[in-house]
Amino acid sequence: MTQSTASAHKTPVVTRTAEEIQALRPQLGRLALVPTMGALHTGHRSLIAQAREHAESVAVSIFVNPLQFGPNEDYDRYPRTFDHDLRVCAEEGVDVVFAPTVDVMYPDADGDSLGQIVTVDPGSMGRVLEGEFRPGFFHGVLTVVNKLFNLIRPDVAVFGQKDAQQLAVVRRMVRDLCLPVTIVAAPTVRDPDGLATSSRNVYLSAEERASALALSKALFAGADAASSGPAAVLAAARAILSEAARATPPVSVDYLALVDPTTFTEVGDDYRGDAVLAVAAWVGETRLIDNVPLTL
């Protein structure tokens, strides 16, 4: 399957087991993988388009990974829309979809015994920001990504800048474990109102969505202040988030941080160079994350 034969609205091959995807792999040539949890949206379409630029064939994995959800998180209600996802993949000319069950990905674990399986430790980078507020999250992410790499054997994998810390942690895993995969970052896709596309946006009511726009507004305000240094960036963003905390419904911030894009350590006021301004917040029962890259 070559780039020239890829066409929109073709039906991708659906594989569900390790044996099926591995039997197909020799036919795929240079392969780019887009790992997803399904509920595909315009952001995922952008990732698929980016993947197409780097390989002959494109694979999309669809797997809601229980290992990256905490005990009080939204694993059970996370959107599962396989028929819709398959239509999106067909429209985008995806060659193969890998949609395993939990039993395929974690054959010796069920329910509570998930905690007994061997996982990939994310190191110190995976214990700050998202790792602090969602303990075990990056263990789950890196473990499933590593398993997908081993099963599918892609040459390239595409991740969104919208999940900037995840992108950085995956890059570190690939480097430290000498994995033969090139990681490509795709820019964040936003809806016309500025909200970063996310599968969790479907949880938001109209009023909650209006409040949630404070996240992107805060980030853009911070980016506009970048020439004045880190303190000005954070002050500009905090001003908007403080106002949003008094809105109806309110925005409740988990963190706002200005970090080094490689290590995700917070930068000091004398820092100059590339950085990421990242935010996580709750609007109603929905937790959203967003970020913008900037140069100080």
UniProtKB/Swiss-Prot annotation:
GO terms for biological process: pantothenate biosynthetic process. The lineage of its organism: Bacteria, Bacillati, Actinomycetota, Actinomycetes, Streptosporangiales. GO terms for molecular function: ATP binding; pantoate-beta-alanine ligase activity. HAMAP family: PanC. Its EC number is 6.3.2.1. Belongs to the pantothenate synthetase family. It comes from Thermobifida fusca (strain YX). It catalyses: (R)-pantoate + beta-alanine + ATP = (R)-pantothenate + AMP + diphosphate + H(+). The keyword Ribosomal protein does not apply. CDD domains: PanC. Beta-alanine binds at residue 68. The active site is at 44 (proton donor). GO terms for cellular component: cytosol. It is found in: Cytoplasm. The reaction proceeds by a bi uni uni bi ping pong mechanism. Catalyzes the condensation of pantoate with beta-alanine in an ATP-dependent reaction via a pantoyl-adenylate intermediate. This is Pantothenate synthetase.
